[in-house]
Amino acid sequence: MNYEQGGSGTEPSEGFNLRVSVGILVRVIFKNPENEKIMLALERTSTSIKSEGKSRVVVRTKPFGGGARILNPNELMNLIGDFHYDSGRSQEESDFRILVNPGNWEKILVVCREHLSGKRVGVIDFSPVRELTEEFQDSLHIQLRSQDYSLTPRGMRIEDELTPTENVNAPGFPTKRIYILYDAWLKSSVLMKMIMANSSKYSDANLEEMACEDAKKGGKGRANAMLSVSLNQLLDFYRSVQHDGKESPMLFMGHQLEWNVRALLELSDE
């Protein structure tokens, strides 16, 4: 493929055939107020998608968090070499989902480690606060406060084996991934009870109906809720199943868990 050189735009030049995704995953955990068991909270999103004149609804159960943000693309280019965003949307939102020359992979790791250690600042935003706040608002319709939880960095997970992405903006592109991991321990018993009540109230089928109804009313065709599960129960299940290394979801208690949930579960084994 020959593409016109475009700096840090969205049109890749020849040789820019590695997609790198840097994401933030937050393990939201709390003690069940009734029995003291450790619970894991996950986000459930339901989206109505139109394709070829037909509509379908996709329900995803995934960790809280989102993409790391590039704060200073020019400085990042000085550090890792030229790059291109994987899509116009990633560029608009400054998401760290980029196409690079494979030879610059190690430079990206260095920059990420420097930001985690505090040696370098101002190039990448690894804070999970914005995403957490938005996702709690979407699911529970509340304003998450800093005093409601304590945030602990858990390091960086590197997935340097190439796998094709299922991201709709760059489907099938060979991708390496970096995850910045955090624990968010909830402090508010009121919030814990709200999460568990929300999890029990809405089934995945309910979320599908809500997304369809939202689309009919002219909305974006979306609905959000939470899922709270026993962390130990989910860990036992995860350890009992075979993993093929692909981006394949897991079916747990009738819920399809996104493949990146495993990054949170493997934290418990460290």
Locations of regions flagged by a protein language model:
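N-terminal leader/linker segments that precede catalytic domains of diphosphate-processing enzymes
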Residues: 1-270
